Amino acid sequence: MPDTTSLDSIISGIETNKVLIENKIIHTLTDCRGYLKNDSLTIYIGPSNKRMKGIVGDCGGIYSWCIGNKDIILMIDPQIQGWIGLLPFSIAHQYQHAYSWTKMNLGALLAMNLMDRIVAEGKADWYAHVLYPDVKMPWDTALSDEGLQYQWSRIKAEMRSEDYYQIQGIMFGSDNYPEFTGYSVGFDLVQSALKKNAALTPEQWSNESPALILEMSEYKTQ
């Protein structure tokens, strides 16, 4: 029989914190709607399974993804200390994705090129940081300034790549790239663009194309 003790403990932890999680979600959605309007979202909550346990741990006990303009999945491991503090940020990140779902073609993940993906994740992270500036995510400090420049020099020629496995390796890390390379570069790229164009509202920059965000940033492909 497979060992399900850990899974049972995670499920029990979610059930124990049910009211806390619900309140966090309600307050976070209120914060999010102050800048971007997207009502009637459905948020699905589940435990981290054995296959996802590593990445959930790397992300501080919360891993989430957007599966439509109205649907967000939260995978939680309450056994990992600090997950409560990261919960609002994770929801806000996916909320921005949900808002941009049709604009950014997020419904066709396999059709996204590397530039689409890097800018999409950077936008979502920037939005979450606007709401929760004191929260630090693992990818915020995954690369030093020198590391960001070096990794950009390696991947900038691949911006048009639609190779799903190559993109995943860059975004999350692989034998060839440090952990969270794509997320770190994406956040820094979008941050550099929007700090220089502070007059843009979240609604405006959420609807800007990846190419224009890249052009506005300090990151250059040449």
PLM features per residue range, with description:
Residues 111-151, 220-222:
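Post-HExxH zinc-binding segment in Zn-dependent metallohydrolases
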Residues 10-69:
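Auxiliary, metal-adjacent structural segments of Zn-dependent hydrolase domains
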Residues 89-103, 121, 125:
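Active-site recognition of the HExxH zinc-binding catalytic motif
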Residues 1-11:
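N-terminal accessory alpha/beta regions
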Residues 75-91:
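Short pre-active-site segment immediately N-terminal to the catalytic Zn-binding motif
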Residues 156-222:
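Pan-zinc metallopeptidase signature
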Residues 82, 104-114, 133-140, 196-201:
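Inter-helical turn/loop segments and adjacent helix faces that build the functional surface
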Residues 19-23, 85-86, 90, 114-118, ...:
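Soluble non-cytosolic domains of exported or imported proteins
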